[in-house]
Amino acid sequence: MKRNTSNVDTGGVPAPLNSTPSTRLIQNGYGDSKYETERMEFPFPEDPRYHPRDSVKGAWEKVKEDHHHRVATYNWVDWLAFFIPCVRWLRTYRRSYLLNDIVAGISVGFMVVPQGLSYANLAGLPSVYGLYGAFLPCIVYSLVGSSRQLAVGPVAVTSLLLGTKLKDILPEAAGISNPNIPGSPELDAVQEKYNRLAIQLAFLVACLYTGVGIFRLGFVTNFLSHAVIGGFTSGAAITIGLSQVKYILGISIPRQDRLQDQAKTYVDNMHNMKWQEFIMGTTFLFLLVLFKEVGKRSKRFKWLRPIGPLTVCIIGLCAVYVGNVQNKGIKIIGAIKAGLPAPTVSWWFPMPEISQLFPTAIVVMLVDLLESTSIARALARKNKYELHANQEIVGLGLANFAGAIFNCYTTTGSFSRSAVNNESGAKTGLACFITAWVVGFVLIFLTPVFAHLPYCTLGAIIVSSIVGLLEYEQAIYLWKVNKLDWLVWMASFLGVLFISVEIGLGIAIGLAILIVIYESAFPNTALVGRIPGTTIWRNIKQYPNAQLAPGLLVFRIDAPIYFANIQWIKERLEGFASAHRVWSQEHGVPLEYVILDFSPVTHIDATGLHTLETIVETLAGHGTQVVLANPSQEIIALMRRGGLFDMIGRDYVFITVNEAVTFCSRQMAERGYAVKEDNTSSYPHFGSRRTPGALPAPSSQLDSSPPTSVTESTSGTPAAGTYSSIGGAVPAVAGHTAAGNGGSHSPSAQPGVQLTTTGSQRQQ
């Protein structure tokens, strides 16, 4: 009995990774005891989708097993690390890390203070809310987050989403030009309600984050492709930049979020531009870009990058205190509330606008989650440690919960600040903790100073910060690689620019899902031919030299079969069968066999199975037998339950296309048909949705000579008894014999390869 070392499903649960391989008897796909073979089991990793009927039970058993393991082996420190992840890096903290973490924390603190003030203004909130968002959420994340370099706080895209959507919910807020000083008791009440909506949104986002993390639903971000997010962030970057140009120009205009409206408003109000703010704003913008570029290009001056925003803030404050520019046409922020944030739990409920807030919370959570996890994974990979994805999501949720409790709007990981944190040498979450207390120091002692900061400074900081969000290089790459992905990118980009932020994102996600549905509903199918001189069967569209055999049609389906694509597959198969029938008759041979290559097919649903039965019956009515090649054990089990396996017949299921063709050609030869391969030049064209370019054959021996005798075998040795080959003699076959029992392939054989096999090589 030959030992089979292939991975054949036993229907059981995979062995633990630390288990040793074991040997046992299994049955092949036919269920025949005479084909019972011995195999070596291998401990493969568990896949909860492998047995869907047992997945829920298996997951629950895994939870119980993990719990029992922890109870049996964990000490109090392990339990503390389980609930507070910062204990993991505290247990291995080195003294050499301390200086790096302090430098990184202070550097990011210098960066986040002016950015926080700017982003809060972009969100339509008082400037101090940006500092609140960089304080307590940062502390909480440093304790419960799993990334050691991620810098948490307010970000530009989220601020834009809030400023856009909340003003749709509360239109009265559009009339407030300075959230720090609304200007009247009525506007004060409107601003307070606006602030309350922002806190309620943060609470909903925190709930979504925590739920996604606890129930391990992080896969939902897979529906936001890189094309969707790239186009979204690029469009949002332009929208953000244009919304801040008014501060650099010194123009007082209402906020507009659509490109055409912004352009019209600027053109109509350009005569109101103040040259003082324009000169100061453009000077600050030049300095910020200069500091950033020099810091990125030179390791010697990398310290310039994080201090750029703080530097222009200091220059602006000096101009106010020394030059008294606020009385010369320069607008300043105004009053900023001093001290640490006060609790706002009472603002959570009642929530009458929940029907409008909840969809926005979903969008904000998805965008923030993708942005944060992508940079966290990149940093973990770069610093060679493991990122716990679900713990990361829970950590962000708890950070937002803390923010919602203490007057903060939604926060997430920042690309720019996280990059600076990593470049500054941050080793652990202590750097994030130090950043929070830099912000806390500003809140307690320096808010009166920042109240005199010119608005053009904040505008310049935001414009310089969003330059990195413009992913035009990604659009060029997608155009070269995949036009459909480029279309999704452009839909997201143009939708955000010309319609609105949330609608543009929705259009892009919808288009991406439609493309996935289209690709799934119209999968690639192929007419397969043999490469001359080999036992390799390939798509004749890609390999024009591949040869076909009259009377034998080999059809490959490159996708799972289910209700959405089975009609397309049926039409393609019927078209190929009709064309092949005519072509075979021209060679004096009827279409005897249709061989379905199921190697790419991983799943068949009930509709697909029923339609396959119809196809088998239809072909049988034309005198054509359906043959299966290389179906998986799961597909065979499904066909058994549905009755399709018995309808086809166990004698017509093979482990390879080559074996199926050899068997069918032998049967046809026994019936008196001379089966000889021919090239595809005379084959009738049958169009395909995809027509890839021709590829070179995978063999240097590309001739059309009659094949010579050699057996296809995993060991490279021919079998003692063989089926007849295409175009060759038909030796007598007494029965099925085991593979690999003698002979060897001679390199001096005639050109070409005879397709021979043994019965024992059928589907096991």
Swiss-Prot record:
Give the phenotype of cells or organisms lacking this gene: No effect on sulfate uptake, due to the redundancy with SLT1 and SLTR2. Slt1 and sultr2 double mutants, as well as slt2 and sultr2 show a 50% decline in uptake while the slt1, slt2 and sultr2 triple mutant exhibits no increase in sulfate uptake capacity when deprived of sulfur.
Q: What induces it?
A: Up-regulated by sulfur deprivation.
Segments passing through the bilayer:
102-122, 124-144, 150-170, 201-221, 223-243, 275-295, 306-326, 347-367, 393-413, 430-450, 458-478, 497-517
Report the principal subcellular site. membrane
Q: Where is the STAS domain?
A: 542-664
Q: Which cysteines are joined by disulfide bonds?
A: none
Where in the cell? Cell membrane
Role, per record: H(+)/sulfate cotransporter with a probable high-affinity for sulfate and a proteasome independent turnover.
Protein family: Belongs to the SLC26A/SulP transporter (TC 2.A.53) family.
Protein name as catalogued: Proton/sulfate cotransporter 2
